[in-house]
């Protein structure tokens, strides 16, 4: 438990500091941003994330598995992957530039070329270095080099937002400039470490047989990664195609920001759990893997229900924009789906360890298709609230499909029956949404009671 808490703290709490600062700055930032600004950013993101799954061709899956299966020789194959990604990133940048040229909204057309340059520069020159550098430290369970880089990048981005949005009144462009500055710093630092300190330089003479094996493992994960877009990004694409007002897209995009905070939390827990989980699978220690699963279940339940219960008060205090402050219900529905994430993390970790990435495609694509088809049918009729509900149902699907599909249900056996977990988590959500609508004093009393209860049972976690 202590190791999980320590690694989660490194991967989650430290990098979350910029997010916390960003949240604290919301009252100031939302005074200088409009729902149209959020709509412009949301529309562009909806299209760029449509191809983001192809940016690495899924090579991170092979990077992970090769670390465990190739022993001390993994760096040899990593150099091949490094060189291959250097070539690929140039082609991907060309593809993304063409896409951006045509889809940037009319309201942002004057900044078209600057947006294109800012969106592609870092990936072309430092993208592969950042991927391999972060994976090296993470797989060696050395979180500090990763998280403190993330902290520095985040703080640079947040305070750049303050300068460009609040003081220079740059509107939506403040996000793009700030993101470029922060990403440049972190990616360039990985390039130096990877090439000079670790001596892991790219091999530009590619071994086609080796690359073919890399792609055999990696390409099936693209639908898995693409499902993230279908769930999180295609909703704004459908809104745009359905001629949803840009201000409404902006409201949904703002609510989605809180979902992105939970994505950071989920990524942190995954970064902490996955190496530990795979290590226990390697040892054949099922009881230890069950303990890790239970701990993650508690983490996510507390975080999700806590946000839902306090969302109304958070938006009331932090959001100084009437159009945006009313979206706390949408944000709560979007965040609710994360309560099922531990089930997904457990079965996908087993898939990556056993290199069963083809099975992962079934789960991811199913969840993604449920989302996309649901958006297409519901958004034109019922608007942005229906998009949030469909997102929740998609998270629900990918959380449980791995335990019901014949090809994957035996990869990892849960410590409890799946149906019991399903009922218990939904009971928690019902209580959380009920408490959210009660007066503040009831919310405070309920929260204190839960904290006291957790303190009593923490030794059993």
In which residue ranges do the predicted regions lie?
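Hydrophobic alpha-helical transmembrane segments
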Residues: 147-196, 366-370, 384-405, 423
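Interhelical loop/hinge segments that connect adjacent transmembrane helices in multipass membrane
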Residues: 1-4, 112, 144, 168, ...
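Transmembrane helical elements of multi-pass membrane transporters/channels
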Residues: 7-22, 153, 175-190, 194, ...
């Amino acid at each position: 438990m202590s190791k999980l808490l320590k690694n989660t703290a490194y991967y989650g709490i430290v990098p979350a500091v910029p997010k916390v600062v960003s949240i604290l700055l919301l009252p100031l930032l939302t005074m200088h941003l409009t729902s149209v600004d959020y709509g412009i950013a949301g529309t562009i993101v909806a299209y760029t994330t449509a191809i983001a799954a192809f940016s690495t061709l899924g090579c991170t899956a092979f990077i992970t598995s090769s670390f465990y299966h190739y022993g001390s020789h993994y760096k040899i194959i990593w150099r091949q992957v490094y060189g291959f990604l250097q070539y690929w990133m140039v082609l991907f940048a060309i593809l993304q530039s063409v896409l951006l040229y045509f889809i940037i909204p009319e309201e942002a057309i004057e900044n078209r070329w600057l947006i294109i340059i800012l969106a592609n520069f870092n990936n072309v020159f430092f993208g592969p270095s950042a991927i391999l550098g972060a994976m090296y430290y993470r797989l060696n369970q050395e979180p500090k080099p990763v998280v403190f880089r993330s902290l520095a990048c985040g703080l640079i981005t947040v305070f750049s937002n303050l300068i460009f949005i609040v003081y220079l009144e740059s509107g939506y462009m403040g996000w793009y400039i700030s993101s470029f500055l922060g990403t440049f710093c972190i990616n360039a630092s990985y390039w130096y470490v990877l090439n000079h300190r670790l001596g892991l330089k790219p091999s530009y003479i590619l071994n086609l047989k080796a690359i073919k094996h890399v792609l055999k493992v990696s390409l099936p994960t693209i639908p898995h990664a693409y499902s993230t877009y279908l769930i999180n990004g295609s909703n704004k694409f459908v809104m745009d195609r359905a001629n949803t007002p840009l201000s409404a897209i902006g409201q949904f995009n703002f609510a989605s920001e809180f979902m992105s905070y939970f994505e950071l939390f989920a990524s942190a827990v995954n970064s902490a759990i996955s190496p530990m989980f795979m290590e226990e699978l390697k040892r054949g220690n099922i009881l230890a893997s069950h303990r890790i699963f239970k701990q993650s279940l508690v983490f996510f339940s507390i975080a999700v229900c806590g946000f839902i219960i306090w969302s109304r008060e958070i938006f009331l205090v932090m959001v100084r924009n009437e159009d945006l402050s009313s979206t706390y219900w949408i944000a709560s529905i979007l965040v609710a789906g994360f309560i099922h994430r531990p089930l997904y993390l457990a079965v996908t970790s087993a898939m990556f360890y056993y290199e069963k990435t083809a099975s992962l495609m079934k789960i991811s694509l199913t969840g993604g298709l449920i989302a996309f088809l649901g958006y297409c049918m519901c958004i034109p009729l019922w608007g942005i609230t229906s998009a949030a509900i469909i997102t929740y149902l998609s998270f629900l699907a990918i959380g449980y499909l791995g335990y019901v599909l014949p090809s994957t249900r035996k990869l990892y056996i849960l410590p409890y029956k799946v149906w019991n977990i399903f009922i218990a988590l939904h009971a928690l959500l019902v209580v959380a949404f009920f408490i959210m609508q009660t007066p503040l004093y009831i919310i405070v009393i309920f929260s204190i009671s839960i904290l006291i209860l957790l303190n009593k049972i923490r030794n059993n976690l």
